[in-house]
């Protein structure tokens, strides 16, 4: 069994996901993902790496679908809920997806897919209300099986699909869990898109691997982020520089009394991370003045996950991305592929 999912059995009664003021245990996640896996399998024993696209808001259902695809032996292809139809069509065509799992909120958006492609449609709402008649036998999934395709941002052309095996995914998770000292007592707010590594691996998967809780907001809202902070339940937060800039701007517009309420909540956090783009030093310094936290910067790519990070417990240097994460080896080479001495620029190679 995939270790990420197997770990969930050790935390069955703990809260795994919180969304829209509802909480779901790991047991509920396992049961729901099993139901989705069966719906995808129909009469098959194994999806054998069939590409299964899915589009649903950040939620408990998102995780159920992702895990359901994996437990059935498929490759999960998350679609961006904000993309126009042409961008979604491109991913379906490029991956040769065999099915798309969707929530009814996106039925209208994806309806043309079923005219343009021979594609099976699976409504998550319909699956969840279906009664399960007997205890199923799901396929055994080896770790070298391909598990996910995530698309790059497409800064140098069309987005490119990056294929990860379950072993790749597991290595990324274990590296971050070790380096950033995740535990089952953690609770993180996830406001990032769930079609990129940052939201899927760094936040969601690390939380679930650890037996922790991942809380979702259905859409980005600065006020709601601070409202969650003020409940003093979350103790980790990860975002991109533009989000920290917006949070700073919003905080500055508040009354001193409202600022004080938020300031108290910052004491509950053990880690705040910035990534996916370079963090301006001015933003880092302003956030530190407001929150008391020095943002941890890290470096990674869709193709490899995270590779470099500032120290969790040690000194964090503004403008620096840090040192190799646990299990990662880094070297810098010249144009002849020779390792350079300290202080000389070159190409970063990651293992």
Question: Over which residues does each language-model region extend?
Answer:
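Conserved pre-ATP/AMP-binding loop-to-beta segment of ANL
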Residues: 134-151, 158, 181-187
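Conserved AMP-binding/adenylate-forming
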Residues: 22, 37-83
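Conserved AMP-binding A3 loop
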Residues: 25-27, 147-174
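Structural core segment of the AMP-binding/adenylate-forming
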Residues: 42, 67, 71-140
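Conserved AMP-binding/adenylation subdomain of ANL enzymes
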Residues: 170-187, 197-236, 246-251
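AMP-dependent adenylate-forming
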Residues: 3-25
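Conserved beta-loop-beta connector loops within the AMP-binding
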Residues: 331-351
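Gly/Ser/Thr-rich phosphate-binding loop
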Residues: 234-239, 249-316, 329
């Amino acid at each position: 069994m995939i270790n990420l999912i197997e770990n969930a059995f050790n935390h069955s009664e703990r809260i795994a996901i919180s969304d829209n003021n509802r909480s779901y245990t790991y047991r509920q996640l396992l049961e729901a993902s099993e139901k989705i896996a069966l719906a995808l399998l129909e009469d098959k024993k194994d999806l054998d790496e069939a590409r299964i696209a899915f589009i649903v808001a950040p939620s408990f259902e998102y995780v159920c679908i992702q895990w359901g695809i994996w437990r059935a032996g498929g490759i999960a292809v998350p679609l961006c809920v904000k993309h126009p139809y042409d961008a979604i069509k491109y991913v379906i065509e490029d991956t040769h997806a065999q099915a798309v799992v969707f929530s009814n909120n996106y039925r209208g958006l994806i309806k043309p897919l079923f005219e343009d492609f021979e594609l099976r449609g699976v409504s998550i709402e319909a699956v969840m209300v279906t009664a399960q008649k007997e205890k199923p036998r799901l396929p055994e999934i080896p770790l070298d099986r391909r598990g996910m395709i995530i698309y790059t941002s497409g800064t140098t052309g069309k987005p490119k699909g990056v294929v990860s095996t379950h072993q790749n995914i597991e290595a990324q998770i274990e590296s971050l869990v070790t380096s950033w000292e995740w535990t089952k007592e953690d609770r993180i707010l996830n406001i990032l898109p769930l079609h990129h590594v940052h939201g899927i691996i760094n936040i969601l998967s690390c939380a679930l691997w650890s037996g922790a809780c991942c809380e979702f907001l259905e859409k980005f809202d600065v006020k709601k982020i601070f409202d969650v902070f003020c409940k003093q339940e979350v103790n980790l937060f990860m975002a991109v520089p533009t989000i920290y800039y917006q949070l700073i701007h919003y905080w500055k517009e508040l009354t001193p009394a409202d600022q004080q309420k938020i300031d108290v909540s910052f004491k509950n956090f053990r880690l705040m991370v910035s990534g996916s783009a370079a963090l301006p030093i001015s933003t880092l310094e302003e956030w530190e003045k407001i929150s008391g936290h020095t943002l941890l910067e890290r470096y990674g790519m869709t193709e490899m996950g995270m590779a470099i990070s500032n120290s969790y417990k040690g000194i964090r240097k503004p403008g620096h991305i840090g040192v190799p994460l646990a299990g990662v080896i880094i070297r810098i080479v010249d144009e002849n592929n020779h390792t350079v001495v300290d202080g000389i620029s070159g190409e970063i190679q990651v293992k």
